[in-house]
Regions:
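Structural motif
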Residues: 33, 37, 94-95, 126, ...
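Short, acidic/polar
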Residues: 22-34, 79-95, 114, 139-141, ...
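A short, structured active-site edge motif that brings together acidic residues
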Residues: 65-78, 101-108, 135
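A structural motif
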Residues: 39, 97-100, 128, 152
Length: 279
């Protein structure tokens, strides 16, 4: 396993397992499978409604808590200093843990400055080892950076071969903020798994499209959290540290970048309304 070092010295696995859209009843089994395969970074969120399943897996897996790296996120419905702090305590309870390794603001909406102050408080109290954000465009990230005491360690954003975030990554690096990908397979959009470029490169290395896509991001220093509910695919997604893409491979994959989201713009009024309606 490769690790990245965050801006406060905390080491984070570069490859993890994400539980977005994993049913609460399935989360425990999936996380136990992921941990048994070798995953140590587990990414969840308050809005996923499966923190309890993750917590059950943490309690049952037999792996020391110190060897796991648990990520969760504060949803806008819990924004604001007091409300966010209470929600952090609730997440800790659901996760059956004394601390969260990485806590993120999930969306750049609501009183996220109040939320960030609550996260800083939890950090100072030892309840959180690192704090950061998710879905923050560079302008919002820079503004936040200049107006908080504890600088954001991570920004989790849509990152895959069709939306590579190359320019955005430069800003994150400038502000010592680790880029973390959600949706590394673009949730299958753009006929992702049948992409001829990725198939061709995969054949050359005897690897799958998914493995090539993950390897591309890993070689760019991106943290990735692929999701699968199937144990064999979890194993395949872990099998990406025994080959290297060539410079030519990297340049070829870079040409797939459209520089546009395949999901929704965080500046789209209808999307903002949707996010703020979710509790």
């Amino acid at each position: 396993m490769n690790y990245v070092e965050l801006n406060n010295g905390v080491k984070m696995p570069q490859l993890g397992y994400g539980v977005f859209q994993v049913e609460p009843a399935e989360a425990e089994r999936c996380v136990l499978d992921a941990i048994s395969v070798g995953y140590r970074l587990i990414d969840t969120a308050q809005i996923y409604k499966n923190e309890e399943g993750v917590g059950n897996a943490i309690a049952k897996c037999g792996v020391p808590r110190s060897e796991l790296f648990i990520v969760t996120k504060v949803w806008p419905a819990n924004a604001g200093e007091e409300k966010a702090y209470e929600s952090i305590l609730e997440s800790l309870k659901k996760l059956q843990s004394d601390y969260i390794d990485l806590l993120l603001i999930h969306q750049p909406y609501g009183d996220y400055y109040g939320t960030y102050r609550a996260m800083e408080r939890a950090y100072r109290e030892g309840k959180v080892r690192a704090i950061g954000v998710s879905n923050f465009y560079p302008d919002r990230l820079i503004d936040l950076y200049h107006n908080v005491d504890i600088k954001p360690a991570v920004n989790q954003v849509e990152t895959h071969v069709f939306n590579q975030q190359l320019e955005e990554q430069k800003y994150m690096e400038k502000y010592n903020c680790q880029i973390m990908s959600w949706g590394p397979f673009a949730e299958g959009k753009n006929d992702f798994f049948n992409n001829e470029t990725l198939i061709e490169i995969g054949n050359k290395h005897n690897k799958t499209v998914a493995q090539v896509a993950l390897r591309y991001l890993l070689q760019r220093g991106v943290v990735v959290i692929p999701k699968s509910t199937h144990k064999d695919r979890m194993e395949q997604n872990m099998d990406v540290f025994n080959f290297l893409l060539t410079d030519e491979d990297m340049k070829t994959i870079e040409k797939l970048d459209t520089k546009h989201t395949l999901f929704a713009s965080h500046r789209d009024p209808q999307f903002v309304e949707l996010i703020l309606s979710l509790k």
